[in-house]
Amino acid sequence: RIPFLMNFAKKIAIRSSKLRGCNMSFWREDFIKINGFNEGLVGWGIDDSEMIQRLHNIGIQGKRLKNTAIAYHIYHKEQDKSHIEINHIIEKETTEKKISFIEKGVNQYL
């Protein structure tokens, strides 16, 4: 993807409250403010969007970089999806109660 080609691409808002967890980066300070990923979530799914919601809850918005940044994906085996509904409930609670900090997160390792 080449920035020059962005001149020919569909224009989208640079700032956005809609983020996709599969390709994202953030400031370390903001990550620590929300205590990182919620390690209370089990299996595959929702961990990234739940964390993004907590970033939104402290006022952090994303910046879209479509066609202007390179993203790498590290291969990993798929995880168990049997807890996806429970994870959705936790994400919904994070949104409704405007939760910004979780107990079981990165603080365990700092």
Regions found by a protein language model. Name each.
Residues 18-19, 23-35, 42-61, 66-67:
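A short, conserved alpha-helix in the catalytic core of glycosyltransferases
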Residues 12-14, 35-38:
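A short, structure-level motif marking secondary-structure boundaries and short turns
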Residues 65-82:
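Active-site donor/metal-binding and catalytic loop motifs
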Residues 68, 82-106:
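Catalytic core of nucleotide-sugar-dependent glycosyltransferases
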Residues 40-42, 81:
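A generic structural signal for short coil/turn motifs at secondary-structure boundaries
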Residues 52-54, 61, 72-73, 91-94, ...:
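Short, surface-exposed, polar/charged, turn-prone segments marking secondary-structure boundaries
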Residues 1-17:
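Short, flexible, basic/aromatic active-site loop/helix in glycosyltransferases
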